Amino acid sequence: TENIITYYAYDDCGRLTWVVTPKGSDLLSAGSSFSPESDFAKQNCYVYFYDEWGRVYEKRFPGREPMYIVYNRGDRPMMIQDGLMREKNQWLTFHYDGTGRITSQRLATDSGLTLLTRETLQMSFDTNSYPQLYSSSASQILTQHVYDRYPTTMPATLAFEEISDMTCDLTGIEPETLLDTSTTGLPTYEKLTAITDSSIGGEYHRAYYYDYKGREIQRVECDFEGNILRTTSRYDLIGNLLAQRESYTHGGTIDVLDRTFEYDSRSRMTKETAQFNDGEQAVVAYTYDDLGQLIGKTYGTGAHAIHETMDYNMQGWLSEKSSELFEMKLRYYDPEPYYGGDAYYTGNISEWWWQHKNVNGNYDADNNTYIFHYDDLSRLNDSRLTYNESEDITDEFVENGITYDKNSNIITLNRSSLSSDDMKNYRFSYSGNQRIKDETSNSDYEYDANGNIHKDALTGFYIYYNLLNLPTVIYTEGDMGLYYTYLSDGTKIEVCGYDDNEPTRYAGSLVYNDGTFESASFGGGRIVGTNNGANSEVHYFLTDHLGSTRVVAKVTPTGREDLDRKDYYPFGKEWTQSGMPTSDNRYTFSGKEQQHLRGQVVNYADFEARFYDSETGIFLQQDPLSEYSFQVSPYAYCGNNPINRIDLDGKRWDDPIQDAEIARQIKDAINAALNALISQEKRINNRINKINDNTKLSQEKKEERIAKEKQKLAEIDIQQDNLTYLSEGIDKMGSEDNPNIFTFETVEDEDGLTSTNTDGVTTMRNNGTFYNRVHEATHGAQIALGDLRVNQNGQALGGLSTPAREIQAYQNQAVLAGYETLPFSDHGGRPTKLKGITAPWIKGIKNSNGQYVY
């Protein structure tokens, strides 16, 4: 056992100035000192510089050139420059409205003979005389945002259109309230720019329309060629999405993807349908147990539908998935004794058994069992495989001999296979977190100024990145390459090969290849174009617990057909097997899109914010949120535990078992509290009956005492309503069919914040205490049930008012964790009863800096 130590240094004001990563900590010695310019700092440290106002004006991360930030007098970032921008003398500028909302982002190029320094630019803002570089009309507009109203200059093609034939039950929805023009505080229009490998240009327009609850009911997008994507949504009264239509007008053709959703009384999805134009309809049905756990999915209809069942252990961890085409089992603390597996009580998977079946539901392939071992940091260091539950362990299709440095960079990784091409014994050397050399091939890696891998030593690929740190070109010698186009918000809209006349285009859920419809995604798989896009058929995806596609299947009136089978090494590389059905499906490991070059799979998967290399288990780019995990390499995939964790969007990894465990703890507390409230209710009702039966009391005394008891009943009703609401919200958050992702994140010394990023991921950040988790889970429930919308900074965009949502959260906190966990307020102190949690009390709460929170 070795110590893994991360050092944090603070200035006299208590501000974080240095973070020395575990690998760098080994290089420290008594009396040693390092400057920010030293190689030690550049490779191993996070360094922050503050101005006299306490603002961070420079950030330095390991393996990256510094980032500079310039502020205005209102402490808002006005200009930012990273290493790649500095090479081109560029600055990213931000422009705001009177309420502090960003109205535009621009890219300004300093073409002067003497380049402006950060200090010079800051001095201009400090004197309220904005520098010409910031105000220059020659700067390139990346994004423009409009709020509260619809601009008169907005293209007419973005006008709202009522969709009257959407196939959903509109019971309870008043048609005249579907579109509401009260858009104060909401984004209404934005103009984006297309970013290619060689240019920034091509306008992309987007308009948003809302109902009276501030829910988006239509989004209209128009690209630089005049193609229009109109996404229309319908909700029920409590915010469940009932129907959604994506209508794409392109080249004189209108394609329509219709999706509908049904729910039970607890807002759990019970059915989803999807249909492209007038083609085959996809149908997926869901069933749940009494605990709210998903226990069944049915793909398709009729006699040949695929029925998938799920089972869980007593902790609520998934233990089994079984269908007619694929079956798997997970063991955590009860491994088979003859495999030599360890028992893990932390949620780590010890053994993973699986087997494919033929279309008749009969086993027609070997069953496989992976046995996993982890180090003390839950990093995978060994995997073994056995066939057909034999006690003989094979070296085929395994990754083992995995070792790490103290920053969790992979030092060694051995892979064995039936295919000689897949057999590898990797040995890597590093400078800080950057992989410098593959010792086995004596090949070197190269990086750009932002720490992105520029040359992949193993494949020979060269990768170039845009200002968003997203790949714009992946190429190798011989004019073989992939060229990407993104919008300025990071949305991928095109990819093409070097000599392709027609790119693959992405429009919402729709994908077009060579100008014809290729596929559309839905909750249970993809609808795939046939006959050059003239027709379509439904492909259902059977996945494992990581969301990786294991079987692609069709359901027809005459039978089932398995089109594709996939198995994976632990870090996500596909097995090379003969005799297995294959298809051209690109959405494989973790459900992410694999990149293809002239029909050949490139071991890079698009995780949205970053690309992942499953060959060696690292990301090509640094984690954009690396400041939340100083102790782990910004290139590491899921903290090097790919068996138990998933990466949602390339920005952070999620541990579903940890999330499920937190949710289970809260649910257990809710159930215990509800049972206690029922007992209290019975006792109060008994007392009321006794009061009524007491002949010695006057009628006036009876009414007086009964009124007091009924006040207690009213408080119990509030508690029951709040707890039931929270329970239903947690069920909604954890539903596999929920299109949005909810996750808990523990950050020490955090006051708690629930936010939703631009990809729809809601993070309930908390300080690790039970009361704080209950509080933030309540906000998560409000979002999941459609009563609250927040942005990536946690600011409300619509729904419940601040007092209403906070009263509910603090009431749940008090009931489940105790009134002593409530904060002290200048207006009422610390309440001891539910009625003390009021709007004035909330407004008197201060944070640790003495500032009012609300």
What do the predicted segments below correspond to?
Residues P77, R86-Q122:
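Hydrophobic or amphipathic alpha-helical targeting/insertion segments
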Residues R652-R765:
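Cationic, glycine-rich low-complexity segments
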Residues Q792-Y854:
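Active-site or metal-binding loop neighborhoods of secreted/extracellular toxin and effector enzymes
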